[in-house]
Design a protein with these regions (language model features):
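Alpha-helical transmembrane segments and their membrane-interface boundaries
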Residues: 1-156, 160-165, 279-448, 458-481, ...
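Conformationally flexible catalytic loops at phosphate/diphosphate-handling active centers
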Residues: 453
Length: 662
């Protein structure tokens, strides 16, 4: 369950958060100037799109700008063709909305178009809705061309601002590694529960973001190729150091303060060097017999391992051409066998069309946000959908409250575009601070911005129409209700179904750690383990948001939470071993592989059989005997035994659908 300071942590300052929020605010203010100066329609939507077009680094933002302009160009061309066919036929217009929506949402669930297909479905369906309400064909064409301008204008402003102010991907990678080293140094100076939580959050972030930034830096041809390779190695080394600090910090600070001071100095100097673009190849920790004699054997082993990692901190490996991975197909392997993909497309389309028919029959177009809400909040499982419903509801109410207050007390006093830009800047800064935070609350920031802009940007002149905010809020509330009922009553999919499959995956990842050769490869596997653990923790939290009818019982969730703690401990301990401990690694790998097979046979495979009988012809191989429990070292034996005992206690998780079947 989230700890008491969960929300406070999500809102507290983090490196780069304020800078990103300020850039979002500046782009919103400049976009507002242009739409008010040239009186283009839908100024609120133009400003709102800024939040979708920008990311913390320059490289990703520029790619998004180009991709969105190309995408909207292609979509408008397709919609113009479709509009010519269905504009005068309401029945065919509704049918085309349903067919296109179902098809695109199926692709959003079952294909490589997953990141954008749902957005395309929303744009196409809503555009066909607007086509039906237009009084003449020429108005349709002009409206669609203005829609292109609504995307191109903020994209152009974003491109200019990001090209000047946004940090390059290479700089983002440098800062991330330097901040990790600063965190390690601070943990050694002030070990405690707060620092342990910070370290755990940093470990869960893994190296994926750094790897992405370095890849973008390669595409940009920014920085020296040797520096990029050094930074890639430094990312792995700093991750291993972070995991080792969990064990090392309490022992070294109590037993050898001078050595701790020297290590902190070394780490801070390395952080400064990396920030200025001079990643060190090696860091020398002065270890002698006197220093090692002053600590316990456990701490001595950790210090020797630490010194080994520091000595190879940023040594760039020789350039090798990596093997090309096997090309993945366009569709997921279970695209046409798993009914959940079809159910998701049908449920989302049905909810959206119910809202469309409702506000059309009521002749109340102001609540069209209910139609949009169904596409935005609908996700693969009930837990994810309920979380997004809550974020949209909170953001909508908060943004509408801020916007209404501005309409009552601030907008009557505004006398220039510059004053309106200042108001937009402040509102966007508040929303941007939330949007620039954790993904657990970022979407709420988007909704705060949307509701606020709908209130304060109503056209080419100041307006005080409170019915706009009222109708949009009513639409969102109604859309939330329809989506909630649809996803909790019609083919509900509990996120609990994914938990055991992910647990099996992380057990396989853990079993692979001892088998790989080379510390670098083992560090990479450890980062994958922590990334999967972070996903599992999120799924366990989301499962508690689901309705009681499909929620997994608490008695099934608690042992799985204990299992995550054991896996986390064991993954950190495996990093202590190097290739010199080959026998211990082999034994640990065999034990873990056997445990993963047994967990698959007892817990995961029975669930897979009941959910998809055609795939149940061949189960996991359980013919192998349990490996002999030979000693693998003090840090491995204990967690391995705890892991085995906890796995033995687990039974297939019962969610709503399995309880109903029983």
């Amino acid at each position: 369950m989230p700890h008491p300071g969960f929300v406070t942590h999500l809102l507290e300052p983090t490196p780069g958060r304020l800078a990103f929020a300020l850039r979002l605010s500046l782009i919103c203010a400049l976009s507002t100037y242009l739409v008010e100066r040239y009186q283009t329609p839908e100024p609120a939507l133009t400003a709102y799109l800024v939040f979708f077009l920008n990311k913390p680094d320059r490289g990703t933002s520029l790619i998004l700008h180009a991709a969105m302009v190309i995408l909207i160009t292609v979509l408008i061309a397709g919609i113009l063709f479709a509009a010519d066919v269905v504009i005068d036929y309401p029945f065919w217009r509704l049918g085309s909305m349903a067919a296109l929506s179902c098809g695109l949402l199926f692709l959003a669930s079952a294909s490589r178009l997953r990141p954008i297909a749902a957005t395309i479905a929303l744009i196409v369906a809503y555009a066909l809705d607007l086509v039906g309400s237009a009084p003449a064909g020429e108005v349709v064409v002009r409206g669609l061309l203005y829609a292109w301008l609504m995307v191109a204008l903020p994209a152009g402003v974003s491109l200019m601002v990001n090209a000047i102010l946004a940090p390059s991907p290479l700089r983002c990678a440098r800062l991330a590694i330097a901040e990790r080293l600063e965190l390690i140094a601070h943990s050694l100076e002030s070990p405690g529960s707060k620092m342990a939580a910070e370290r755990e959050r940093a470990l869960c972030e893994g190296n994926q973001a750094i790897a992405k930034w370095l890849k973008l830096a390669h595409l940009e041809r920014s920085g020296d190729p040797v520096e990029r390779r050094r930074l890639r190695e430094a990312a792995g080394s700093s991750f291993a150091l972070l995991a080792l600090t969990e064990r090392l910090a309490p022992a070294i600070t109590r037993q050898n303060a001078p050595l701790c001071v020297e290590l902190v100095r070394l780490l801070r100097e390395a952080a400064v060097a990396i920030r200025r673009g001079d990643c060190p190849e090696t860091l020398r920790l002065p270890l002698d017999a006197v220093s090692l004699a002053a600590v316990t054997p456990e701490a001595r082993d950790a210090l020797l391992r630490l010194a080994g990692i520091l000595s190879d901190f940023g040594i760039a490996p020789p350039v090798v051409t990596p093997a090309q991975p096997a090309r993945k197909g366009f569709f997921l392997p279970d695209a046409f066998t798993n009914p959940e993909h079809r159910h998701y497309a049908f449920k989302t389309t049905a909810a959206a069309l119910f809202c469309y028919v409702t506000y059309t029959l009521l002749d109340w177009p102001g609540i069209h946000t209910c139609f949009i809400t169904c596409y935005i909040v609908s996700l693969g499982t009930t837990g994810e959908t309920v979380e997004k419903l809550g974020l949209r509801l909170f953001g909508c109410l908060a943004g509408a409250a801020l916007g209404t207050a501005a309409m009552l007390w601030l907008i009557p006093e505004l006398t220039s575009i510059e004053a309106l830009m200042a108001l937009v800047f402040v509102g966007a800064l508040l929303a941007g601070w939330i949007a620039a935070g954790s993904e657990r609350i970022a979407y709420a920031g988007y909704q705060v911005a949307f509701a606020f802009f709908l209130c304060v940007l109503q056209g080419a002149a100041p307006a005080f129409d409170l019915t706009i905010a009222r109708d949009r809020v009513i639409g969102i509330l109604f859309g939330n209700l329809v989506a909630y009922l649809m996803f909790t009553r019609v083919w509900p999919v509990s996120i609990g179904q994914r938990i055991d499959r992910l647990l099996l995956g992380v057990l396989r990842q853990l079993a692979a750690m001892p088998r790989v050769r080379g510390d670098r490869e083992r560090q990479g596997r450890a980062a994958e383990v922590w990334g999967t653990l972070a996903t599992l923790e999120k799924h366990l939290d989301l499962s508690r948001l689901e309705p009681r009818s499909i929620r997994p019982p608490e008695a099934a969730l608690q042992p799985r939470e204990r299992l995550l703690d054991i896996i986390r401990l064991l993954a950190g301990n495996l990093l202590f071993l190097s290739d010199r401990n080959a026998r211990e690694l082999i034994r640990a790998g065999r034990q873990l592989e056997w445990m993963a097979d047994q967990f698959d046979a007892r817990v995961v495979f029975p669930r897979r059989v009941s959910a998809d009988p055609p795939s149940a012809s061949a189960g996991p191989d359980t013919s192998r005997q349990r490996p002999a429990q030979l000693p693998s070292g003090a840090w491995i034996d204990g967690p391995l035994a705890d892991l085995g005992h906890t796995l033995d206690e687990l039974q297939p998780m019962a969610t709503g659908d399995t309880r109903a079947a029983a």
